[in-house]
């Protein structure tokens, strides 16, 4: 009877260990996916920042061109 109880405890511990190992495995997979998504998001953010910098630079050039060579400058309003 004592051996049967020990075997039942061993089975319960083994089942619990398997459950915990399974959870850890899923968490590791989720962590890998989150890490990959974060890396991709950082790349997209860096590309967007570079694009924004470029667009602001181009906008500045357009503004300078418009102020240097006004086309049909409107008359002053008093």
Curated annotation (Swiss-Prot):
This is Protein SlyX homolog. Belongs to the SlyX family. Gene3D superfamilies: 1.20.5.300. It comes from Xylella fastidiosa (strain 9a5c). InterPro entries: SlyX. Pfam families: SlyX (PF04102). The gene is slyX.
